[in-house]
Amino acid sequence: IIVPDSAHGTNPASAAVCGLEIVQVKSNAMGLVDVEDLKPLLDDTIAGIMMTNPNTLGLFEKDIKEIAALVHACGGLLYYDGANMNPLMGMVRPGDMGFDVLHLNLHKTFSTPHGGGGPGAGPVGVAQHLVPYLPVPKVLEDVDGSLYVEGSGADDTCGRISGFMGNFAVLLRAYTYILTLGKQNIRMVGPLAVLGANYIKESLKDSFKLPIASVCKHEFVFDGLLDQSTGVTTLDVAKRLLDYGFHAPTIYFPLLFHQAIMIEPTETESKETLDGFIEIMKHIAEEALNDPESLKTAPHTTPVRRLDETTAARQPVLRYRDLA
């Protein structure tokens, strides 16, 4: 499986769990899949490529049709990680870009909590030519609009799988969200998210390092502070944000940049909230120059200060008392 170097780690991990070898394709200077680097990787041993579009840098892969043609020509499939469907809802169909299989991240695009206190749910969709391989049973619609259950399926079906419906409550929330917005309003989600992201990006590019200056979609990535002479890191900026009442954004991801700060405002934030965030980020950038220690020792107002996050991740304590 070919995976871009900008991809989320779950992409190569998922393929590896299935026993596939991971081959990485590089990004070009614009942060997009380098088509020339991709071409030598394509042969009859390739099962396919996993991509997100827009990609993890928030950039639309403009060469996606060419990439699809190249991968299909050697017998491979295109798998779409639906993490970034937010700016495309109601405007672009992944199948029209050439994708054969996709999953939708309901917590990223369709307003559901991240699992809702239980397992997550990621609906999987396939192009028509892969329908015979879907698991059974299947709920189908007859010509008269009635529904029926097909228990056996085609000879190529992968058969029955346990928990095939995932977390039903999460699916129901996503379905409710879609019905509530309706066809017209769901098309407004993307433009609002894109507008908010670009507004923040352009407002902060004189304070934070912007490695790729092109128009982004719903998210973008800074590479730390523009002036890094004081030694203030992305982690320091994230911790200081907590003192001002803002949840810290994703940091140190994607791995293409050493001091990555990923900012994704979504479509729901008001201009007042965006302006408040911009003001605080500019203030933090000034603090980094004039009082760097205030960032290096942040946060100052939270119940706990800096945790040993490495130990917490590797040796988690999941109970408040020892039950042994």
Protein language model annotation of sequence segments:
Residues I1-D144, G231-V232, Q259:
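Conserved PLP-enzyme active-site core in the AAT-like
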Residues D81, L102, V126, G153-D156, ...:
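Short, functionally important structural connectors and interaction interfaces within domains
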Residues P54, H107, S111, T176-K183, ...:
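A broad detector of the eukaryotic-type serine/threonine protein kinase catalytic domain
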Residues G118-G120, G163-F168:
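FAD-binding core of FAD-dependent oxidoreductases
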Residues P4-H8, G76-L77, T176-L179, H218-F222:
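Short low-complexity stretches enriched in small and charged residues
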Residues S27, L104, L172-Y175, L204:
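A generic, residue-level signal for flexible/boundary positions that often mark functional hotspots
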Residues V92, D142-F164, L171, I178-A324:
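Non-catalytic terminal extensions of PLP-dependent enzymes
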